[in-house]
Amino acid sequence: MVAPGRKISKTSRASGIFPFGTTTSPLSLPPSLLLMDRLLYLLSLSLVTLIRLLPITVCFVLGQILGLIVWAILPGYRRLSKQNLRIAFGPDLTPGNAATITRQHFANLGANILCSLKIPALSEKQLRSRLSFDQEENWEDWIVGKEANGQGTVAALSHFGNWEINAQIAEFVKPRRAGCVYQALRNAKMDDLVNRDRRSRGVATFDRKKEMQGAATMLKEGGVVGVLTDQHAGNAGIWMPLFGKLASTSPLAASLAQRTGALLAQVTVRTVGLARWVIHTSAPIPTEGREITAITMDLNHLLEQEILNSPADWFWVHNRWKLPYPNFLLSEVKRGIYLPSEITTADLQSFNILVRSPNWLGDACMAIPSMRAIKAGRPDLRLTILSPAKLAPLWREIPEVDAVLEIPPRSSPRKVASLIKKAGHFDVALLLPNSLRSALEVWLAGIPRRIGREIHRGRWLLNQTMAPRRELHPALHQAEELLAMIRQLGAPEPAIPPSRVSPSGSLRIGICPGAEYGPAKRWPLERYREVMENISRQREVIWVIVGTAKESTLGEELAKDFPGSVENLCGKTTLTELITELKGFQLLLTNDTGTMHLADQLGVPVVAIFGSTESILTGPTNTTTPPHRILRHKVECNPCYLRECPIDFRCMKELTVDTVTTAVVESLSLNP
């Protein structure tokens, strides 16, 4: 459970319209890239020069037209905008409203970008004529600083309206000094072009990677410093709700204000007409004695309100709720996850993951610890298992599984994809089988992140892979190997399930004498019979024989004329009924079968007999009381993994009845 108002796991960009990375020394760049940088700079400089010849109203209209052209020719960004709008506004947002807001957003964005190139050429008087102030007393008191009492002010900015105006209004806050924290561009000439105009207005610029001490000094001296707060902050951010969905959020504004004793207020720029904007300033946000997480959450709440007031103005084409790569599970994020006290995990928008189940019972059972780890990976996670219908009852037994989608027998990949689509939106698909079919199912369903093993047969349909670990640890158990791969996605260690309470009443021992894989995994049937007789002479036992319909003759032969109490359920139980029966056993004596793995996951003590397979890799793993007993007679040719022994079956025949009887008796003595 998440503790409200607390971090629940261990763990800024500034204004600018050119989305490049951090500055790199020209000497470290290849000549071709240097040439491209130079050409981009010259092209941008020419564009800026041309735009500044135009009236600002023409820039605004031309920008709207260009924005609508981009809206028309880039459907991917339209989809991203609508996706973000659905997150923010939820089911109340109709498709028509989403389309209208998206179209208006592209028009506003184009207009504001072109105007941001024109604004540095305006005089102070011309710029003032284009601006008005909402909550002007807040602007005067906390940004201009009339009521700041010598304290600095951190202006929490966002990509809202014409956000570049924030870097052009230093003259409006005089005599206070003004600055902004920014992320330097990789292209040094472009970086200089962007910052030249800001500095011409008297705004000091601080590279967030190198010059934060300068920003802190300005604040301590009573200045005002702008910091962007609304971009995806990656591993540097705190994961907290924005419109109820977890997003990585920069704590820089809050920490800078608290560290320097500065005031903190939000400033946004709304578009209200033809080349006209309103600057909105919030009242100061309390910081003294509060956690950085709580202060940052307040900024998110204020941003939500601004977006609701002017939805077309926010930067919807930014992937604000970006899915991290490769660690989309958040147990190891640097700054942790934070939920305010008024929000519970049930209030969060779900992060939906679809896991394609293995097709075999044993493999599915060995995947259960990994499903527990995935579920613990983030508080908003909703875990759905896509399972063959025959295994659906198993997954419904697992508390960490929220939903099960059954694959009807003989369903085509396209039909399964349709089933997935009808179930709703999924953020991630994780494929446990290595089959091409499983990859086709989720690819056809349009799930954006599709993950499987590096050796997956449908790897070309995946966009993230997990590296197997068995080549580094050849003796790694299959369940541990899968857990090691799941950890590559950011999963924590799985929780240990609660201990099973042994059933009271008559002593019921299960017998599973078959193995669908083949006779090489079956201890001789007559020896099972001898063990049953030996134990029955010592204790009163109800023997229950379990197995598949194909093994019904084995059950009949084993039960025939048995002198004690025996129930033959071979081929007579559904998986649900088998689970119920297993829960009533004090012990299961079995070959290496899916039923063995099922008993293991249910916490039923097991005496397991291995022959052609390797117990180190696929034996029972759960901790039970009494502990599991694994019996095998090691010979030079096992494990061979053959379905039938081509020689003398020595690995099974040399495992004696006395050895197995002793193991059962010892296990029962620990579980009276």
Locations of the language-model features?
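Compositionally biased, intrinsically disordered low-complexity segments enriched in Pro/Arg/Gln/His
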Residues: 26-33, 672
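Membrane-anchoring hydrophobic helices of lipid-metabolizing enzymes
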Residues: 33-157, 192, 196, 202, ...
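Non-catalytic C-terminal accessory region of glycerolipid acyltransferases
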Residues: 73, 100-103, 147-148, 172, ...
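Short terminal hydrophobic/aromatic SLiMs and anchors at protein ends
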Residues: 1-2
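Low-acidity, Ser/Thr- and Arg-rich intrinsically disordered low-complexity segments
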Residues: 6-15, 25-28
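Catalytic machinery of carbohydrate-active enzymes
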Residues: 5, 44, 75-78, 106, ...
